[in-house]
Amino acid sequence: MKYIGAHVSAAGGIELAVERAVAIGANAFALFTKNQRQWHAPDLTAKTILAFRTACETAGFLPEQILPHDSYLINLGHPEPEALEKSRVAFIDEMQRCEQLGLCYLNFHPGSHLKAISEEESLRRVAESINIALDQTQGVTAVIENTAGQGTNLGWQFEHLAAIIDQVEDKSRVGVCYDTCHAFAAGYDMRTEADCIATFAEFERVVGFNYLKGMHINGAKCTFGSRVDRHHSLQEGNLGTAVFEFIMRDSRFDRIPLILETVNPDIWPDEIRWLRQLG
């Protein structure tokens, strides 16, 4: 079974994200559990936690169908000690919020070296940050997202993801979210079935499908290998549709959240229906 949905708004209360997912015909969804553009957020109340858990249970969403995303401010590979510590504290808080809500994943961008330290050192800091967070939480898997490689962002090469995972002590609580637009921008071709076979074989060789915990299903406004992060609707842009057909027909992508972050929320119901028809 394919779990397909979108990153829906949690405005007005995180339990409303569940209603919005149901409204677009989704059986998966992503959300922010706090304002993603602020460092601090009020603690979750018992009332909020109960409302969210009840909404999920009523709508039939299991934890493995939900892929929460952390704040964009967090940089777990930051070169400066004070800024790194600030990011780590915020990341632990995000993990704890997921734990309170009964969620099993937290999706995040690995971080940036900001041209101040080496890639290797920044990747080491990301892994160390994950280890610290896992020690202080239970039941939540840290899900590293591949990036487009814009600026000094790490995570655009499969080898970056593998290097982080290799240094995480509890391998059972680390995973990867594969973003189709980001991979295309980073130079991983998926424009034909043959391209998909080759790219996902490389993913299996370098990272491993056992670590794949979710996907972001996005078209690409950016050009191939441009290292620029620009999403598009599924049937528009430069990526084409072969990869979406490939994903929908391959059982390796079953039972993980397949999350739209495409540019027009008005057509999310149509895009979800279209993806289901491909399978």
UniProtKB/Swiss-Prot annotation:
Family: Belongs to the AP endonuclease 2 family.
Keywords recorded for this protein, A-Z: DNA damage, DNA repair, Endonuclease, Hydrolase, Metal-binding, Nuclease, Zinc
Identification of the protein by name: Probable endonuclease 4
InterPro entries to which the protein is assigned, alphabetical: AP_endonuc_2 (IPR001719), AP_endonuc_F2_Zn_BS (IPR018246), Xyl_isomerase-like_sf (IPR036237), Xyl_isomerase-like_TIM-brl (IPR013022)
Role description: Endonuclease IV plays a role in DNA repair. It cleaves phosphodiester bonds at apurinic or apyrimidinic (AP) sites, generating a 3'-hydroxyl group and a 5'-terminal sugar phosphate.
Lineage: Bacteria, Pseudomonadati, Pseudomonadota, Gammaproteobacteria, Aeromonadales
Cofactor(s) named in the record: Zn(2+)
Catalytic class of the enzyme: hydrolase
Residue numbers binding Zn(2+) 3: H182, D229, H231
Catalytic activity: Endonucleolytic cleavage to 5'-phosphooligonucleotide end-products
Enzyme Commission designation: 3.1.21.2
Gene Ontology MF terms in the entry: deoxyribonuclease IV (phage-T4-induced) activity; DNA binding; DNA-(apurinic or apyrimidinic site) endonuclease activity; phosphoric diester hydrolase activity; zinc ion binding
PANTHER family membership: APURINIC-APYRIMIDINIC ENDONUCLEASE, ENDONUCLEASE IV ENDODEOXYRIBONUCLEASE IV
Residue sites binding Zn(2+) 1 per the record: H69, H109, E145
Record organism: Tolumonas auensis (strain DSM 9187 / NBRC 110442 / TA 4)
Cofactor remark: Binds 3 Zn(2+) ions.
CDD domains to which the protein is assigned, alphabetical: AP2Ec
Residues that bind Zn(2+) 2: E145, D179, H216, E261
Pfam families listed in its UniProt record: AP_endonuc_2
